[in-house]
């Protein structure tokens, strides 16, 4: 069974976790010029993009 030989410091574990982040969805410009979230239906035109 694998057991760590030394304690991992807070800064080292935080450096490893820097890539665990949430990316926000960027709005997409629709044909009528409004911005909306991707994979959603535009209520005015009814377009799904």
From Swiss-Prot:
NCBIfam families documented for this protein: rpmF_bact
InterPro entries membership: Ribosomal_bL32, Ribosomal_bL32_bact, Ribosomal_zn-bd
Family: Belongs to the bacterial ribosomal protein bL32 family.
SUPFAM superfamilies per record: Zn-binding ribosomal proteins (SSF57829)
Superkingdom of origin organism: Bacteria
Name listed for the protein in its UniProt record: Large ribosomal subunit protein bL32
Entry GO CC: large ribosomal subunit
Keywords of the record: Ribonucleoprotein, Ribosomal protein
Species: Sulfurimonas denitrificans (strain ATCC 33889 / DSM 1251) (Thiomicrospira denitrificans (strain ATCC 33889 / DSM 1251))
GO molecular function ontology, one term from the record: structural constituent of ribosome
Region (Disordered): 25-49
A Gene Ontology BP annotation from the UniProt entry: translation
């Amino acid at each position: 069974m694998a057991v760590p030989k030394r304690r991992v410091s807070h800064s080292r574990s935080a450096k490893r976790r820097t890539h665990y982040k949430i990316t926000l969805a960027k709005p997409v410009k629709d044909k009528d010029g409004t911005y909306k979230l991707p994979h959603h239906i535009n209520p005015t035109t009814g377009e799904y993009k």
